[in-house]
Amino acid sequence: WDLNAIYSDNELRDVTFGQFDLNRLRQGLGPSFIDASGTPRCGTAAAVLAGCVPVDLFGGPDAFTREMADFTGVTLKDETNKELYDYTANITGDLFELPAGPLGFAAGYEYRREQGYFLPDAITASGATTGSAAQPTNGGFSLDEFYAEFNVPVLKDLAFAQVLEISLAARYSDYSNFG
């Protein structure tokens, strides 16, 4: 016989670089003008977008500056968690002796519960990045499972049958989310 217990808690914090904030990219690529001091500004002379950095995608290989990248770039932070509880009990052995050998038996039970969640960065959830949008999600399920197996020896060491056995097995599974 054996008894087992497993607990697992996996947490992932994913940091993604190299994506752009679409709202800031729109601002940086939107209307712009050169102010009186010769500095490019976002918006119009009548409505300057404070803090915005105009983005130049067509000015040659060095036109996209570090300042532009810092303004439009975003670091995304997602969180994922999965938790598992698993308990099993099993018993095996021979029940009694038959003429062709012992009647083998095995039975067991398992209870398992899994749950988890995913929390994307707020910008990812809003769909305002150049990457794929994703929504927060969570869920879980539990399972109760029973099994029984029998190995029935029928014939042994005969001229026409070295070994003849019948194996019988049954399993019952009850999932909390279906079936």
Report the location of each language-model feature.
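Transmembrane beta-strand segments that form the barrel wall of outer-membrane beta-barrel proteins
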Residues: V163-S176
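Surface-exposed, low-complexity loop segments enriched in small/polar and acidic residues
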Residues: W1-D144
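Short loop/turn motifs that connect adjacent beta-strands in outer-membrane beta-barrel proteins
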Residues: F96-G104, L155-L164
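Residue-level signature of outer-membrane beta-barrel architecture
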Residues: G93-L95, V152-V154, Y172
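Structured alpha-helical segments in the cores of large, soluble enzyme domains
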Residues: G140-D157
